[in-house]
Structure formats: C-alpha cells, structure tokens
Amino acid sequence: MKSERPKVLHEICGRPALWYVLKAARAARPTTLAVVVHGAGDQVAEAVRPWGLEPSPTFVEQRELLGTANAVAVAEYAVGRVDDVLVMAGDDPLVTGEHVRELLSVHRRTKAAATILTASLEDPTGYARVVREGHRLVDLVGEDAAEADPEIRSIREVSTLVYAFRRDDLYRALPLVGRDDRSGEHYLFHVLRILKEKAERLSAARIDLGGGMGVNSRSSMARVSRIMRERIIGAHMAGGVTFVDPATAYVDVDVRIGPDTTILPASSLEGSTRIGSGCTIGPATRIRDSVIEDEAEVTFSVLRESRIGPRATIGPYASLRPGTVILEGGKAGTFVEIKASRVGKGSKVPHLSYVGDATIGDEVNVGAGTVTVNYDGFAKHPTVIGDQAHIGSDTMLVAPVKVGKKAWTGAGSVITKDVPAGALAVERGEQRNVPGYDERKRAARAGKDRKQAAGKRSRKRAPRGGRDSG
C-alpha cells in the first residue's frame, strides 16, 4: 500500500476494511473475538475500540510475520474452549454476515472438520484453485501446480481467506504445518491437506463477491471500493431512491436516504449523512456528516456537519461549513458561504454573501454581497438579526452587532452599532449630483485630444539634424 497506515485501516466507502470484516464476523455470534496484529497493533486497537463491538475484541500480537497458520496459532489462548473457529482475513471487506452464515451452515450441516469459503474470479491468478464434488472439497491446488495443469488452470473458483474449523482439529493440525519452500511462511490452507490426509471431511461454500477479493494494493482497493459502492447504491435503489447515474455517485456505508429522493450525477454522500424523503441532491454535490430533511434541494454545493430543514434550497455553489443550520424553507443561494450560523424559517441568503457566527431570525432577506465581519484578528464575534429584517445589498455587519426585528439596513452600509427594531440604518457618504457633467467631461476630453494632435504635427514638420554636404 506504500502507506504509514496499516492496510486494514484504509477506508472503503467511509469505514476501514477491518470494520466490515468484524461486522461480518459478528454474524457468527461468537463468544470470543480475537484480532491478530503485527507491528501497528496499538494503532489498530485504538481505531477498533470506539466501534463498541460485543464481544470486545482481544488483540493478539504476531511478533514475526510467519504466515497465516502462525497467526491462527498465536491466537489459540485468546480463542478459548469453543466448538468451532471462524478465521477471516482482516483485509477482505467484501465478505458479509450473510456469507459467514452460509459458511457455518454448510460446515455444520456436513459435519466437516474444515470448510472454506470460495468465490469465482475472472482472473484467478495468484489464488489457490478449488476442486470439489458438491459441497465436498476434494482438493485445493496452489498457483504453481495450477499453472502446470491446463485443466486445473481453467478453474475460476478460488479459496478466500475465510475458513471454519472444528477447534480441536485445527489446533492439532497447526503444529504439523511446515514452512513454505519459497516464502518461509506457514500457510493456513496447508491445514486442509493435513486434515485430508487424516481422512477428515472437508467442505466448501461458494459465494458471490462481485469479482473482488482482498485489499492488497491501491488498485485492488479501488476495485473493492467500486464493488462496495454498487452494493450500497443498489440497496438504496431497492428502498426507493433514484440514482440518475449510479456509476458517478459515491455513497458511504453509514449514509441513510429516504424514499423518493433523487441523487443526480457526480454527487458524494459521506460519513453519517442523513437525507430525508423527496429531496433532490446534486449534480456535483458533496455532503458530509449532515442532515437534509424532507423535500430539500441541494445543487452544486459542499456541506459539512450542517443541518438543512424541510423544503430548504441550497446552491448552486454554496459552501456550508460545520455548525450551519438552515430551517424550513430557508435558502443559501449562489456563491454563499455560511459557517456556525442559524438561518431561520423562510429566511434567504440568496447570493454572494458570507455569514459566520450569526443567528438570523425568520423571514429575513439578506441582500447580495452582505458580509458578517465576525473576526477582529483575535476572536470571532456574533451577529444577531431579528425576524423579518431586511439587510441591504453590500452591507457589512461588523460584529458583535444586533439588527432588530423588522429593521432595515441601506445598501452599501457598514453597520457597527446595533439597529433598533423597525429602524433603518444607513451609513455612507451623501450622494451629490453634478448637473451637465457629461457635456463638460466630453468637451474637456475633446480639447485635450486636439492639443495632443497639434503637438504631433508640429514634431513632424521640424527639420532633422544631419551631416553637411560638399
């Protein structure tokens, strides 16, 4: 991955890869949950704890990278005395709880010593091929042997790194797993061969992973993310949400969207965003950790940690920063930036304005070019605007300042003092009209042009100095 971050903590659709794996593992209703880590164990543990998993995971350190069999071996005491052990790779987020339940169902129904989860890939290069008869696993053929046998090479079904074992069979076989000749590691799938030699029953459960497997590189992470997005968006569409172009929509796993909402192209819904029913989002809109209530519209805009009320209108090209609240029927229009502010019911900030640290009442109109001047170079200060106030275009509201209910400000005013309710505040130089200005201006310009032209003609007639002849 070429990263300082552990591979299992790289995010897929808003959550680390490991989050999906542990979520799937919980479908088995485990009595114990062990996470084997190497190197950045503290970093992984710190990331996992806030997820509030039950049972709480036990973190086991694999001091040397000696392979998957060794990783399972070092977790023996953390696993405890149980009947079955489920083993999953921490970098395979496409495996779901449904897949885990299918694996365990086959494992218990066939009374197998070990059962593997399998999937079909268009390109199975690098994976062990599965040879089976029904649910019975006949053989698991490694990459080198598969390349040597055309019949095996044609098999597309491969082993995932998800296994179910009878505990006692697993931990009796692990000490017998030798080192791989090429890598020097101990591989878990060698346990299957040992169990097969002991005439134990082996089973296989096939699932559909959508053509993806684990995350081993940036390119595989992009492929897995695409498959995950397709799953997420498919679930939303099944719930009554319209995606005009699903291929250009980016929706994180924790996002919730109500029915009859339309998501237009090139929109990104991230984090814990909640969108109500009957909304229109996009195109080219990014919303993170925000709440959009019913029938709101957000167009060509960026929202972070904001709340938008019913039937409110945002954009185009609005930027709503953390702490912004737009109440029912409110508007933040074209090229408007709002931060840590509350805009009341039916109030409008239509265009080209900055509103920061402000409380705006109901049915207020904020004219174009208005700025709440909230920063004095050291601290931020609040602006309060009462209900039904009218803020003239290009008004500078120098905070801290209050504009009363039904008060007005004149266009172009710099308001530095509180404005009483119902009053008009105007702060600008008095307009002076100069009669006949255009005629005098043009006459003066014409005279200047004539004088310049005469000067040019005079210079052309003047004799040029030169060498005497003769």
Please give the residue ranges for each predicted region.
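N-terminal nucleotide-binding beta1-loop-alpha1 segment
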Residues: 1-4
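Conserved beta-strand segments of alpha/beta enzyme cores
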Residues: 8, 56-58, 136, 201-203, ...
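Residues that recognize and position ribonucleotide moieties
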Residues: 10, 93, 163, 214, ...
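Conserved N-terminal catalytic core of the sugar/cofactor nucleotidyltransferase
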Residues: 11, 15-109, 446-447, 468
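Conserved core of the sugar-phosphate nucleotidyltransferase
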Residues: 42, 95-182
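Conserved alpha/beta core of the MobA/IspD/sugar-nucleotide pyrophosphorylase nucleotidyltransferase superfamily
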Residues: 156-258
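Structural signal for interior beta-strand "rungs" in well-ordered beta-sheet cores
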Residues: 242-427, 431-432
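Long, low-complexity, intrinsically disordered segments
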Residues: 456-470
